[in-house]
Curated annotation (Swiss-Prot):
GO terms for cellular component: ribonucleoprotein complex; ribosome. One of two assembly initiator proteins, it binds directly to the 5'-end of the 23S rRNA, where it nucleates assembly of the 50S subunit. One of the proteins that surrounds the polypeptide exit tunnel on the outside of the subunit. Keywords: Ribonucleoprotein, Ribosomal protein, RNA-binding, rRNA-binding. It comes from Kineococcus radiotolerans (strain ATCC BAA-149 / DSM 14245 / SRS30216). It comes from the Bacteria. CDD domains: KOW_RPL26. This is Large ribosomal subunit protein uL24. The gene is rplX.
Amino acid sequence: MGKTRIKKGDLVQVITRVRGRRNADGTKTSDLGKQGKVLEVIAETDRVLVEGVNRIKRHTKARPGVEGGIVEREAPIHISNVQLVDPETKKPTRVGIRTEQVERDGRTKTNRIRVAKRSGKDI
């Protein structure tokens, strides 16, 4: 469980296959290369929810006030299986940190800025 450099709202790309995924007809499927926006970061388990990636079907039982049926939603994917998409090149990139000293009201504050390693641009 480390400090993650991927945040909610970032555009990421899946860089590995997720094991055990199958289509309805039993053939293997993969989200490799798909891009999507991060919906949620689960820091405790180092996982992220990515829009349109790793979709699963849940069979829910009807309860009072809630209709039952098959619900399709995103399942978490490990953070090591995704990479941030560089805003300039639109390709996956690693993320670096650049520190910047800002002086305001006589006090010095350090800002940490995320930087795309591929292009060197701020994220």
